[in-house]
Amino acid sequence: MKQTFLSGATLAALVMLVALPLVFILLQAIFPHFSAGSLGDAFGGIPALLADPQLPAMLGGTLWIAAGVALVSVMIGLPLGILRGMFSLPLPRLWDLLFLIPFLTPPYISALSWMLALQSQGYLQQLTGWQLNDLLFSRSGIVLVMTFNIFPVVYFAVSRSLLASGTRLAVVARVHGASAWRAFWHVTLPMLSPALAAGRLLAFTLAIEEFGVPAALGSRAGVVMLTVGIEKKLADWPVDLPGAALLSLLLMAVALFAWWLQRRLVGEKEVTSVTGKPGENHGTLLGWMTLPAVLAMAAVGGLAVGVPAVSMMLTSVMGTLSGGVSVENVTLRHFAALFDQQGDALSALGTSLSLALGSALIVGALGLLAAWLVMVQKIKGRGMVDALSLMPAALPGVVVGVGLILLWNQPFWPRSPYNTLWMLLLSYCCLLLPWPVRYVGSALRQLGPNLEPAARVHGASPLQALRLIVLPLVFPALLAAMLMVFAVASRELVTSLLLSPAGTQTVAVFIWRQFEQGSVGQGMAMASLTLLTGLVLMLTALALMQRRTRG
């Protein structure tokens, strides 16, 4: 009975978090007056959308930028991943940590940091006399800025695939007369194809859903993307709910088409080593190529991490931007202002930390139950539970925000979380649910199928087996996922902009508003603290995962 209740409650929570927002987007897109309670004029919003002169620019800009980011991410991440996975590099874990930082840094903060560094009268021009304003505010500049945040997904996909599969098959090919290049081309690269395809698709998906970078750089570059268009339809008066819903469906269609196209190009084949479980991969010695390889890794790390970090820290300790880079202009007053009891910073920080903690606890519990019901209990309807729990991984944040607005801003609800902090909590939980599902699912696969049946033989109920056996064993993975959720939720931007109640700010909204108001130093001081907090949480999560792996 208790298990049936848990199954029903889990499915109901997933329907509320994931399915209903998507259903209401679809209803609003089909019936333009649905928000007013009318089902008339079906598909009446489509002609207005097609007549929008901005539509070709939004769709074309989204596809151009996303394709460029995916391509350049492969160009950077593939060779670096090969260096890390196939060869013996000095301090290999240091490179992994270095390339985690761009993925951890909120893209909008990176974009603002690049602006301060490269624009006219920016730090580069002050220090060297050069400026890259024209490159920064262009399509190519937007692609590069986004790529420096996104390429780690390709790097880690490639390097982890190589570290897992080893290089023994390539060595066998060399023994049988193949050249190094031929062995790589015909043996190693095909083994990499699934991981490379997954990384490329993820890079494309992350690019099409990005809001902060095109919002910060796009207007001066003449580039508009679908995410920015959706936000404008909700932020500008009069609010265009049908237009926002239709653009959200279009954005989802782009993501699904990319997934379908990749499956057509790559196929559903799986590449498997026939040698059994690979042993530890120590990597091939590079010899005289070690220094060039290290320099290449350091150059990418310097651009992806060093430039934004230095720009961020410089801005946070400069009294005024007009004062330039000088010792006389150094101050800590921006950091002191964050802790001013009469300011908005402490309130924003408290709001973000509370929401992040709530999100981590809720999705941790829901993700644990979903993974356990699907993989261990194998309940009826487990396919639906699995699909709903992982679907948010393919949903852009702006789409989730639109769906929640359309769902809860309806007159028939007796009580609604609309225009309260509960909306932010719902959005964070929806977006970040796949993290604990994947982490716990991976841990459950490693446990094997015999532990819980053994507990059942000795009289334990399914819930007792979950509480006394399964939970202690998967807890390190669950805690790591919850820390990741906390770190990401504490700096989420687009849903915070769409759903924050009037007069309430999160850390991300605070930073964004500081730039809009010209208080750049205080915004970057908050960004520095946010990045440091996220990095500490990320390192803690990695340590927990490593401990679980060793155990």
Predicted regions and their residues:
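Membrane-water interface segments at the C-terminal ends of transmembrane alpha-helices
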Residues: 2-35, 51-163, 191-212, 216, ...
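A short amphipathic helical element positioned immediately N-terminal to and/or at the very start
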Residues: 41-51, 184, 330-340
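Polytopic alpha-helical membrane proteins, predominantly small-molecule transporters/carriers
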Residues: 59, 177-178
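Juxtamembrane helix-boundary/capping and inter-helix hinge elements in multi-pass membrane proteins
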Residues: 87-91, 163-168, 178-180, 221-222, ...
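Short cytosolic juxtamembrane segments of multi-pass membrane proteins
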Residues: 169, 270-282, 451, 544-551
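The alpha-helix within a helix-turn-helix
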Residues: 173-174, 455
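Glycine-rich helix-loop "coupling/hinge" segments at transmembrane-helix boundaries
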Residues: 212-238, 324-328, 493-520
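Alpha-helical transmembrane segments of integral membrane proteins
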Residues: 260-296
